[in-house]
A protein has these predicted regions:
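Conserved N-terminal beta-strand and adjoining loop/helix that marks the start
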Residues: 1-19, 40
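Short secondary-structure boundary/capping segments
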Residues: 2, 11, 26-27, 73, ...
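A short beta-loop-beta micro-motif enriched in histidine and acidic residues
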Residues: 7, 29, 100-101
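Unchanged
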Residues: 41-65, 72-124
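C-terminal alpha-helix
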Residues: 127-131
Length: 131
């Protein structure tokens, strides 16, 4: 039986309605592909708290994970990813810096599919575009 890995992702939207997109590091799976920032839920951790922790670690910003926007399960050769993506509120962006990702962009919803997204995030991107 394949291992199920539970992960969380953040949908961060600026006042202009642009969505924060992050390019994965060269030394991780799916290098150079785009994703919603986030990460794995640690054992015993609440999903919202995991997301807030991951965003602090990866982007050095404070957020509040508000509500689940989408849930996706994607099977890969060796494991299954269960992704919960949350609408988030940025509480403090003043100390922002990329800690893990190669690059970031703020993109209009209708232009999101111009990026090369990791497979797990594509259903969420498609749902965002329809809003």
């Amino acid at each position: 039986m394949k291992k199920i890995i539970e992960v969380v992702g953040a949908i961060l939207e600026n006042p202009n309605g642009d969505i924060f997109c992050a390019m994965r590091p060269k030394d991780k799976t799916f290098p150079g592909m785009w994703e919603f920032p986030g990460g794995k839920i640690e054992e015993g951790e609440e999903p919202k708290k995991a997301l807030e922790r991951e965003i602090k670690e990866e982007l050095n910003i404070d957020i509040r994970a508000d509500k689940v926007f989408d849930e996706v399960q994607k099977e890969y050769e060796e494991f299954i990813i269960k992704l919960s993506t949350y609408n988030c509120t940025v509480l403090d962006f003043s100390e922002f810096k990329l800690v893990e990702h190669q690059e970031f962009k703020w993109i209009k919803k209708e232009s999101l599919m111009t990026l090369d997204w990791i497979p797990t995030d594509i259903p969420t991107v498609e749902k965002l575009i329809k809003l």
